[in-house]
Amino acid sequence: MTLVMGSCCGRFCDAKNKFKKDDIEEEGEGYCDYKNLNDLDEATRIEFGPLYIINEEKSDINTLDIKRRYRHAIESVYF
């Protein structure tokens, strides 16, 4: 199961668009438990900046640009 936080509830669950959200069973293959941060009340909200995972073998231009700009390697971010 993948937990996706954000306003992307209309998207497909996997990168290859193999499973649509409506076509899969709960807890089955391709199932995503979507949590829309906009639906949380003010008391439970936390604010955080952008999170980046940089792996030079898999990075795109944007993440490599971030790495150059801040001049340090960001391996992973946990919250």
From Swiss-Prot:
Protein name: Protein OPG051
Family from the record: Belongs to the orthopoxvirus OPG051 family.
Matching InterPro entries: Orthopox_F7
Record keywords: Early protein
Induction: Expressed in the early phase of the viral replicative cycle.
Short name of one Pfam family: Orthopox_F7
Organism: Variola virus (isolate Human/India/Ind3/1967) (VARV)
